[in-house]
């Protein structure tokens, strides 16, 4: 499968949208629009800057900026890529948060595959672009959005927020937690070929298809 031509990175100032300008421009546009559509408004309100691997002409830049604006992003200034490291130990490094105006908490945006023994702890929302493998854990004070497969552990609302939710493209977790309520995956896991959302209903964690931001709580 061809490598993604778009990479989105979070910084203190906003989102850096890294573009592989060697790819077909129509492919770049389609990939960018697909990423925003899949995020379902998660980026809305964030500042952005385009970072192509080689210069774009003014028409190409305008078309890509238009796609970003259509999904609620706003052009930003002085957005720079933070220095990053991912140590071999258990704690995975993360960049500075992206503040989204549509939420009361900052958002951590990062990408990659979280491996067995690695753990992300963050007081705000976490958006992970990649898979979370068995034995890996994400803990967030707010919501967790995994744009990949969740096979490890995800704990949202870690400071007691009962309205927090966990969304994954493929929901196959070892363990889910929301506001201290824990649910463990059954031995016979049912795999569904669509995104799902886990929320707290009473004292139970309920998983529904993620059809829209207003998908049923029942």
From Swiss-Prot:
Interacts with MinD and FtsZ. Cell division inhibitor that blocks the formation of polar Z ring septums. Rapidly oscillates between the poles of the cell to destabilize FtsZ filaments that have formed before they mature into polar Z rings. Prevents FtsZ polymerization. This is Probable septum site-determining protein MinC. GO terms for biological process: cell morphogenesis; division septum assembly; regulation of cell division; regulation of cell septum assembly. Belongs to the MinC family. Keywords: Cell cycle, Cell division, Septation. SUPFAM superfamilies: Cell-division inhibitor MinC, C-terminal domain. It holds the Pfam family MinC_C.
């Amino acid at each position: 499968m061809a490598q993604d031509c778009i990479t989105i990175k979070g910084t203190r100032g906003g989102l850096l949208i890294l573009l592989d300008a060697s790819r077909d421009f129509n492919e770049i546009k389609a990939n960018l629009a697909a990423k925003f559509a899949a995020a379902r408004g998660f980026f809305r309100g964030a500042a952005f800057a385009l970072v192509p691997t080689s210069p774009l002409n003014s028409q190409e830049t305008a078309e890509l900026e238009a796609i970003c604006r259509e999904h609620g992003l706003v052009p930003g200034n002085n957005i720079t890529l933070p220095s990053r490291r991912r140590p071999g130990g258990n704690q995975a490094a993360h960049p500075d948060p992206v503040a989204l105006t549509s939420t009361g908490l900052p958002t951590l945006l990062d990408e990659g595959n979280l491996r067995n023994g690695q753990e992300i702890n963050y007081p705000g929302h976490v958006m992970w672009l990649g898979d979370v493998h068995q034995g890996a854990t994400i803990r967030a004070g707010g919501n967790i959005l995994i744009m990949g497969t969740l096979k490890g552990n995800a704990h949202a609302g870690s400071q007691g927020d009962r309205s927090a939710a966990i969304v994954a493209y493929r929901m196959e977790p070892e363990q889910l937690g929301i506001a201290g309520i824990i649910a463990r995956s059954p031995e016979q896991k049912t795999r569904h070929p669509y995104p799902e959302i886990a929320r707290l209903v009473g004292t139970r964690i309920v998983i529904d298809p993620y059809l829209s931001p207003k998908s049923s709580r029942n």
